[in-house]
Swiss-Prot record:
Catalytic activity: a ubiquinone + NADH + 5 H(+)(in) = a ubiquinol + NAD(+) + 4 H(+)(out)
Role played: Core subunit of the mitochondrial membrane respiratory chain NADH dehydrogenase (Complex I) that is believed to belong to the minimal assembly required for catalysis. Complex I functions in the transfer of electrons from NADH to the respiratory chain. The immediate electron acceptor for the enzyme is believed to be ubiquinone.
Enzyme nomenclature, EC number: 7.1.1.2
Bilayer-crossing regions: 24-44, 53-73, 82-102, 143-163
Molecular function via GO: NADH dehydrogenase (ubiquinone) activity
Protein name according to UniProt: NADH-ubiquinone oxidoreductase chain 6
Enzyme class name: translocase
Keywords: Electron transport, Membrane, Mitochondrion, NAD, Respiratory chain, Translocase, Transmembrane, Transmembrane helix, Transport, Ubiquinone
Tagged with keyword Electron transport: yes
Record organism: Drosophila melanogaster (Fruit fly)
Membrane topology per record: Multi-pass membrane protein
Length: 174
């Protein structure tokens, strides 16, 4: 039920994102969509660690984009159109009603048979075990994880060296 609602909210924010013009509104919409995706990822796994790390990475990227956008479009007015608000609220209401209808029909169809219920329970058990975070740090994938950590560290060092205060692209204008 919650996953269907999150799917509908993700689709709604995607449609809103396509209709935005202002860069700060685009960033805010992207941040809200990131929160929804992280909540959905956390609900699909056993723990919220993966979604928390994903959110922090996205938030760091959004902060860098926010710095660039505020230096480019600092004096633009941010106004919200009534047409876009009405359109997005209608889409959201439609998606939520559709998710409620789909949830009731799918649960009544699946609960009619005990065999189907046992298959659903078995499927959820396998999904929980397959999406566990233990696989991320065990033998076959630990090399990829260490490589990704080293790549992020080197990228951080390079970005710090590139964006020195008086020599980088984010320098003070006097």
């Amino acid at each position: 039920m919650i996953q269907l609602m999150l799917y509908s909210l993700i689709i709604t924010t995607s449609i809103i994102f396509l209709n935005m013009i202002h860069p700060l509104a685009l960033g805010l919409t992207l941040l809200i969509q990131t929160i929804f995706v992280c909540l959905l990822t956390g609900l699909m796994t056993k723990s919220f660690w993966y979604s928390y790390i994903l959110f922090l990475i996205f938030l760091g990227g959004m902060l860098v984009l926010f710095i660039y956008v505020t230096s480019l479009a600092s004096n633009e007015m941010f106004n919200l159109s009534m047409k876009l608000t009405l359109f997005s609220s209608l889409i959201l209401i439609f998606m939520l009603i559709l998710s409620f209808i789909m949830d009731k029909t799918s649960s009544s169809l699946f609960l009619m048979n005990n065999d189907m219920q046992s298959i659903i329970n078995m499927n959820s058990y396998f999904m929980e075990n397959s999406l566990s975070l233990n696989k991320l740090y065990n033998f076959p994938t630990n090399f990829i994880t260490i490589l990704l950590m080293n790549y992020l560290l080197i990228t951080l060092i390079v970005i710090v060296k590139i964006t020195k205060l008086f020599k980088g692209p984010i320098r003070m204008m006097s």
